[in-house]
UniProtKB/Swiss-Prot annotation:
It comes from Tityus discrepans (Venezuelan scorpion). Has the structural arrangement of an alpha-helix connected to antiparallel beta-sheets by disulfide bonds (CS-alpha/beta). It is found in: Secreted. Its main location: secreted. Expressed by the venom gland. Beta toxins bind voltage-independently at site-4 of sodium channels (Nav) and shift the voltage of activation toward more negative potentials thereby affecting sodium channel activation and promoting spontaneous and repetitive firing. This toxin is active against mammals and crustaceans. Residues 1-13 form the LCN-type CS-alpha/beta domain. Keywords: Ion channel impairing toxin, Neurotoxin, Secreted, Toxin, Voltage-gated sodium channel impairing toxin. Belongs to the long (4 C-C) scorpion toxin superfamily. Sodium channel inhibitor family. Beta subfamily. This is Toxin TdII-2.
Length: 13
């Protein structure tokens, strides 16, 4: 998916 996980800067899931 296109988005950023909270707590992970620049880590896309």
């Amino acid at each position: 998916k296109d988005g950023y996980l909270p707590g992970n800067e620049g880590c896309k899931y």
